[in-house]
A protein has these predicted regions:
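Flexible loop/hinge segments that line or gate small-molecule binding clefts
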Residues: 88-131, 148
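N-terminal winged-helix
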Residues: 32-52
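N-terminal helix-turn-helix DNA-binding module of bacterial transcription factors
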Residues: 1-24
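Short, well-structured alpha-helical segments in soluble
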Residues: 67-81, 185-200
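Central regulatory/effector-binding core of bacterial HTH transcription factors
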Residues: 49-94
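Short beta-strand elements in bilobed, periplasmic/extracellular small-molecule ligand-binding domains
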Residues: 51-62, 142, 158, 162-187
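Short beta-strand segments enriched in small/hydrophobic residues
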Residues: 20-36, 139-148
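Hydrophobic alpha-helical segments within soluble ligand-binding/sensing domains
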Residues: 118-143, 156-159, 184-194
Length: 200
C-alpha cells in the first residue's frame, strides 16, 4: 500500500509543495526593530507561544531600525507565502503597507487607517512605573521620550508617568530624544544624561 511504502522509504513530505497547493504556510512573520531589546524579546516570546498553540510557526525578522531592511523583509514575506504579518516597525511610507496583499496587524503604531492596530495600555503603564519610582523614594527622575507623532500613543505613557511623579513631589525632567539609538548605545547615553541633568 501507499502508506506501507511511505514507512519503508522513510518518506518526508515536501512542505513547500504542500503549502503551494493549499495556499497556506502556517507561518506568521513578526517584524521588529531589535529582538534583543527586553520589550521586544518578551513580546516575541508570548506571540510565539500563542501562535504555536494554534499550529502556526513564527518567522522573526529584525530590521535594526533601517528602512531598506524592513522593505527587504516585507518583500521576502510576500514571495515566501507567509499567512500574515505582525508589524512592530514602521519605517516605510503608508502606501507600501497598504499595497501588501497579506493580512497585517500593526503593533502600537497606526501605519494606515485600514490596517488594524493593537495598542498597549499606555496610561496604566505610566501609572505603574511612576508608583514604583515613588515607592522606592527616588528623588530625581529623567523621563526620556522619542519624537512622537499622532500615530503613536506611547506619549501617553510618558505624560501620565511625568504628571504622577510631579504631583507626588518627585523631580522629573522630561527629555525628548531626537535621534534613534540602538539598544547597545542606550546605557552609555543614559549615563551622560544623568550626569548632565540629575547631578545638579
Amino acid at each position: 500500500s501507499v502508506y506501507k511504502a511511505i514507512d519503508q522509504l522513510d518518506y518526508v513530505p515536501n512542505q513547500i509543495a504542500r503549502n503551494l497547493f493549499r495556499q497556506k504556510s502556517y507561518y506568521i512573520s513578526l517584524i521588529v526593530p531589535d529582538s534583543s531589546h527586553p520589550f521586544w524579546a518578551e513580546i516575541t516570546k508570548y506571540i510565539e507561544k500563542k501562535l504555536y498553540k494554534h499550529h502556526y510557526k513564527l518567522f522573526l525578522c529584525n530590521t535594526g531600525d533601517t528602512e531598506d531592511k524592513e522593505r527587504d523583509y516585507i518583500k521576502m514575506m510576500r514571495e515566501n507565502m507567509v499567512d500574515g504579518i505582525i508589524l512592530g516597525t514602521h519605517m516605510l511610507a503608508e502606501s507600501e503597507y497598504q499595497n501588501l496583499d497579506l493580512p497585517i496587524v500593526a503593533f502600537d503604531y497606526r501605519v494606515a487607517e485600514e490596517i488594524p492596530t493593537i495598542y498597549s495600555a499606555h496610561n496604566k503603564g505610566g501609572l505603574l512605573a511612576a508608583n514604583e519610582i515613588i515607592k522606592n523614594d527616588c528623588k530625581c527622575v529623567l523621563n526620556v521620550t522619542a519624537v512622537v507623532t499622532d500615530k503613536s500613543p506611547s506619549i501617553n505613557r510618558h505624560r501620565v508617568f511625568s504628571e504622577t511623579l510631579k504631583k507626588n513631589g518627585v523631580k522629573c525632567i522630561d527629555y525628548i530624544w531626537n535621534t534613534k539609538q540602538r539598544t547597545e548605545e542606550y546605557h552609555q547615553q543614559m549615563n551622560k544624561l544623568f550626569d548632565e541633568y540629575c547631578e545638579k
